């Protein structure tokens, strides 16, 4: 565990602010307190032995305790100032342990070559897999696959061909996603690596090309949410039920763009297998999170020991030659657990949620939305006919999942004279293993054969129906139940179909019965009333038993909050002191020290990338900048083009830029010659694409709310010229807003834009930054 002491200068400031904060608190209570009185009170605290011990502990405590997420990012951040400890909100340059690309490897390669790169910075950092369109045998797709394989061979990259398995599963079973490391992938379900204690998070193609060429890209550390599990899962309830319930019960964007850390008592976490954790972590993507991290604990250690033993016996590879045996070794395992990374006591979380697993029952997601989750029992009563069932995807198609599905048919065989029953008439049941090793394991147990005997249709190991590709897609009017991770309208076929998500046993039972149903393994506990969940850690204050150390940590945490409040007051009331003591942000040469403009307000939340740049232009590569400027925001407001002017600052509501990953959503705004976008919050991919393409952005909820207070009454105006102006002082990390001629003027602190990100924007975006870095 990393540790650090407060520097003398940092401690001095901490005490100064704490004195100031305590003084103001005391003044608010007495209305007559003076600084001299405060000093006397403070001195009296030091004379009390208990208080003296507290302040002594505060003296030697860590300056800012880190979450597990922050600790891992700390390890893989480069170019940090000496003594810098990263925290949520920081922009950092990261050098990830691994970077995986799949079928999009060829577009990444084209981008890589277009920037003048000729060799990979570190071939061992890169993994390439073919998994998405593996059923497509067209000449065009096979040519692309050959090009990817040739590129990988030329550059010495570990490559996994079509049919070997899904990239995320390969990252896990081949040891690329190693506990305590940072791994990225150009795919949204890289969150899955968190199931083995590896911080996995998605990147876009330009980022991947940057990692290939330089070994690095950038990342803004998200706010971190702690999710505490209590109790243990009842028989018949699975990890899929856990994450489906979380998506449906906390469905107000509770963890949108957060990094999640799952925790719980030793008993609770011991009850969650690695396969269960992988399922939960995988679907944190659908919950809106950027990562889903489980602890590095005894459960994981046992799983890794099994992998290391298998590798040492030469059994890890099967018919496939890999280097897994070099990654799964007992010496590496012992080294990992000598001092495993954990969150510091007192680490700050943006929010805390809890779920009592013992109160959970089987859940089903949908139709056509992960935000709709219903207890299976309620849906069974509706006799919903099922046309297609799917045991596929990286979420739930490992050997343990296949075994659970096979068990449904094996139990039914006991009532059928020992003969495996067939799936219901009119139902098609598709199965595809997450990888060939998982399929081989299922075959070794006889489970794969059981499903085939029941009438299942085998698909190649890889993606397929779950991403709307290949055989078995839903037709108009059909109903499907799938063990995959995403069920929005049209995802698995027709937009006129209904898609539900459930556990492997629910999928199997539904295929067998012909209607949405379960195997009957779950029995409602006596006295059950509801799923127990909420904010916090779920421990009632009257039940909270704290050790002296924990009580001290709690008090220190409360004092740290008081310090933070005092710093805010200190900053607002004594700006000169703030600047001299905290310093100013360094400005990268060529980056503007100030950005100013008139505010044009698009008053809407969830403006998606299709609203910003119409989809019909997305795959036209020859659209000139003038046309991009003209169609910018066209699907949101056709009048935007004539209302917004060059040099304006665009302000919109919350979750601006959600939706697809099209880079043109950023470049179209730049084509309109708007240099800065301000919103209540941004979609994560839009944020990445903005910086990668040199568009500046600020999150200022206060400004959005103030604009709505001022202009909210009367007729709705989609795009409004406000007459307000904003000046962003980059050095001070502060904006100044002038509410029209003669109106109020106010300032507000904003997040720091550090020099490493300024450099990317000043160079004209990430591609040009990479060109400069490699001397192309």
Curated annotation (Swiss-Prot):
Binds 1 [4Fe-4S] cluster per subunit. GO terms for molecular function: 4 iron, 4 sulfur cluster binding; homoaconitate hydratase activity; metal ion binding. GO terms for cellular component: mitochondrial matrix. It is found in: Mitochondrion. It catalyses: (2R,3S)-homoisocitrate = cis-homoaconitate + H2O. Its cofactor is [4Fe-4S] cluster. Keywords: Amino-acid biosynthesis, Iron, Iron-sulfur, Lyase, Lysine biosynthesis, Metal-binding, Mitochondrion, Transit peptide. Pathway: Amino-acid biosynthesis; L-lysine biosynthesis via AAA pathway; L-alpha-aminoadipate from 2-oxoglutarate: step 3/5. This is Homoaconitase, mitochondrial. The gene is lys4.
